[in-house]
């Protein structure tokens, strides 16, 4: 039976009648944020799988900000299986004592596109902290970069090693994850044009990026690793103490190029450094890259990572709308220049040379 999980009444009916949960109706709240899901926090009078507060994500078939940007609702099953996989392989997260974690997956209902998971509590995203005044402390930024870089390297290591295991091979079939990346890459040319950049290399760049993400089986990638999908738990009364890092939104998790996770997070760091706080963004980028290089069992393809960073810059500079129009124009031009460096394997290019220098100090 299908329920309307976009409304509070429909949600409560679903939880009480379909799942037989004892819901505290005064503790039901729709959460803001998120581009493609309706998300609720629900307080319970009696525990569900040991939890008295849960999160329910109801998948929508399009972006909340753009109904023409379609995205299959079956993506939620991949998120559910991804967070279950991470909890079953805690060494990827850094072990039981590690500070990197994911919410516990509790239930997935295919008919209603409903994913229920652990409520990890009310905390701010990394994006919230890097855009705050004053911004995140540099020491915390360094620790965040180090921890996430190590986590991603371990994810890529195990993804390569266990590619043929059924529970890993499953993610090769995340067609929505692949096509969503394709749709994002298709924004590169119009985004560049919006800032007056019409470069004949861009169609070739987009084709190469799309071909790679649609067909690569290199390793397991999180594929949506940016500051808006990372929660930080700081010690109460002691904001200089980082207790936990939660990685959210695993819907796009799939087999693909390792450079996707590197380019996405490092590209986000470049945006933060340019438009928010240079020291925080740079520190986090360096720590991430160095930690990844130390932990990864495979060498980094710097040309592909440079292209990934360039793609992130061109795709997201306009979306974030940080800085002035002139600053955004210059930054998009920097991204396009990086495409040329990646294409020509130019180790002396601004971004590529920085990556080589910083990772060599690992």
Swiss-Prot record:
Reported uses of this protein in biotechnology and industry: The pharmaceutical interesting psilocybin as a treatment option against depression and anxiety is being investigated in advanced clinical trials.
InterPro entries referenced in this protein's UniProt entry, alphabetically: Aminoglycoside_PTrfase, CHK_kinase-like, Kinase-like_dom_sf
Cofactor(s), names only, from the UniProt record: Mg(2+)
Active site: 224
Entries under PANTHER family matching the protein: METHYLTHIORIBOSE KINASE
Task of the protein: 4-hydroxytryptamine kinase; part of the gene cluster that mediates the biosynthesis of psilocybin, a psychotropic tryptamine-derived natural product. The first step in the pathway is the decarboxylation of L-tryptophan to tryptamine by the decarboxylase psiD. 4-hydroxy-L-tryptophan is accepted as substrate by psiD as well. The cytochrome P450 monooxygenase psiH then converts tryptamine to 4-hydroxytryptamine. The kinase psiK catalyzes the 4-O-phosphorylation step by converting 4-hydroxytryptamine into norbaeocystin.
Subunit-level organization: Monomer.
Protein name according to UniProt: 4-hydroxytryptamine kinase
Species in which this protein is naturally found: Psilocybe cubensis
Gene for this chain: psiK
């Amino acid at each position: 039976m299908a329920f309307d999980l976009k409304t509070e009444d429909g949600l409560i009916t679903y939880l009480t009648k379909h799942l037989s949960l004892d819901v505290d109706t005064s503790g039901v709240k729709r959460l803001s944020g998120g581009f493609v899901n309706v998300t609720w926090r629900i307080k319970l009078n009696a525990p569900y799988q040991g939890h008295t507060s849960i999160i329910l994500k109801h998948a929508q078939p399009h972006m909340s900000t753009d109904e023409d940007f379609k995205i299959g609702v079956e993506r939620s099953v991949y998120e559910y299986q991804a967070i279950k996989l991470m909890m079953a392989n805690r060494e990827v997260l850094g072990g039981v004592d590690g500070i990197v974690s994911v919410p516990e997956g509790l239930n997935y209902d295919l008919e209603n596109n409903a994913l229920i998971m652990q409520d990890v509590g009310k905390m701010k995203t990394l994006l919230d902290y890097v855009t705050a005044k004053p911004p995140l402390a540099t020491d915390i930024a360094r620790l965040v970069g180090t921890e996430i870089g190590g986590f991603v390297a371990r994810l890529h290591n195990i993804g390569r090693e266990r590619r043929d295991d059924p529970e890993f091979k499953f993610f090769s079939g995340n067609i929505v994850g692949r096509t969503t990346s394709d749709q994002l890459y298709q924004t590169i040319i119009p985004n560049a044009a919006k800032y007056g950049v019409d470069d004949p290399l861009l169609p070739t760049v987009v084709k190469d990026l799309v071909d790679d993400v649609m067909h690569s089986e290199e390793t397991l990638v999180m594929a949506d690793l940016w500051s808006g999908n990372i929660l930080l738990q700081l010690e109460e009364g002691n904001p200089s103490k980082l207790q936990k890092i939660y990685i959210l939104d695993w819907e796009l998790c799939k087999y693909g190029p390792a450079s996707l996770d590197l380019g996405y997070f490092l590209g986000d760091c470049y945006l933060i450094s340019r438009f928010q706080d240079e020291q925080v963004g740079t520190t986090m980028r360096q720590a991430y890259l160095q930690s990844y290089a130390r932990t990864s069992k495979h060498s980094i393809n710097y040309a592909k990572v440079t292209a990934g960073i360039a793609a992130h810059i061109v795709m997201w500079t306009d979306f974030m709308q940080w800085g002035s129009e002139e600053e955004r124009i210059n930054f998009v031009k920097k991204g396009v220049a990086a495409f040329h460096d990646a294409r020509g394997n130019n180790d002396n290019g601004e971004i590529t040379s920085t990556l080589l220098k910083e990772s060599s100090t690992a």
